[in-house]
Amino acid sequence: MKKLIKILLLIFFIFPFINVYADYFEITSKNVVLFNLNNNEIIYEKNKDEVIKVASMQKIMTSIVAIEHIDNIDEEFYMEGYMLYGLDPELLTVGFYDGELVTYKDLLYGTLLKSGADGAYSLAMKISGSEEEFVNLMNQKAEELGLKNTHFVNSHGLDEDTQFSTVYDIGIIMKYAYNNKIFKEIISTDSYTTSDGLYTFDGPVKKAHNLGLNYFNAGKTGYTEEAGDCLVSISSFNDVGYLLVTAGAEPSFENKNFIDQKNIYDYYMNNYSFRNIINKGDLIKRIKTKYDDEVLLKSKEDVSKYLNNNIFNKDLVIKYDGLEVLDRSIKTGDKIGKYQILYKDEVLYESDVYSPITVKFKLKKEYLITIIALVTILFMWLIYLRIRKIRRRKI
């Protein structure tokens, strides 16, 4: 027993700084970024800015660019040979063929749910007349979104030497596209049957729900040998929205991309939540005016933060950096400093602090007592002189 205690003490002193609340989950994905959509913060990342191949996740960009150039997604037209010309027959994932009566909606669902290269390529050819021109639109949109590590060469996502992106950039594209009503409806759909009734296909949402990811609202898969298994998704749990992008998972029949996402989602959904770290009216700091009046600096708002459930408010520190004494130059609303809320060395929140009062001239108590005393002495002296003068007259 004594030996065991010695060993435990040795371990404790050799490894004193291990964080028992460290994030932990098993994944094979090489690149990950998880956004909290409630506050647009990144809450987990792994090689998020590494330039990689992203496979069919780039069909998100193909689809949103197409939607923004289509007047009516229910418009019917016949597939023509040029819309499929040059596409490898193995890439005809949906099965669209020359002469088939389709709608833009069919092509969009085929692109996002079935991940059909024939859907993406046909959209590009129909809208721009050539894939090259359509890809120019995709790159223009990437530039508009401020994506500095993304460049497209084709519309369908097959690997090209000069085609690349990052999981972070894919997340930004997904966030942008999801704000479009048509895109959101399509990518959130379980399954779809084309307008001619020839094809029915399930999407990532249905697959995710079958695998136990019941919080999964929308998603797009991707795979090439170089990119590995990829997945971008949007989920929600307990009023918190998430956007997760994973890439480079080990290809297998075990759906490693979905398993990785489940492990990440489950960890954060079970161990993290939003809560107030300071409430409106809570005291930040007690300071004084030049005239010794006390001034209470208080929080102007509730501040909510997404934190590990094992971190409590008593573990947080409020640090004020600003004026400790206010002089007559200070008016209500003047900036007098800033404050931070910290957990260990991590800054959770930072805000400017403004004076709640206008400082007015006021005699300090000790000065006032001195003045009263002097006035009293002077008054008594004057009385003494008056009395003395009267006595002299009588004499």
Task: Describe every region a protein language model picked out.
Residues 13, 23-25, 235, 329-330:
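Sterically constrained small-residue positions within well-ordered secondary structures
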Residues 147-148, 159-164, 168-395:
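Domain-terminus/edge residues, biased toward the C-terminal soluble/receptor-binding domains
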Residues 10, 17-19, 59, 108, ...:
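A generic alpha-helix preference that emphasizes hydrophobic side chains
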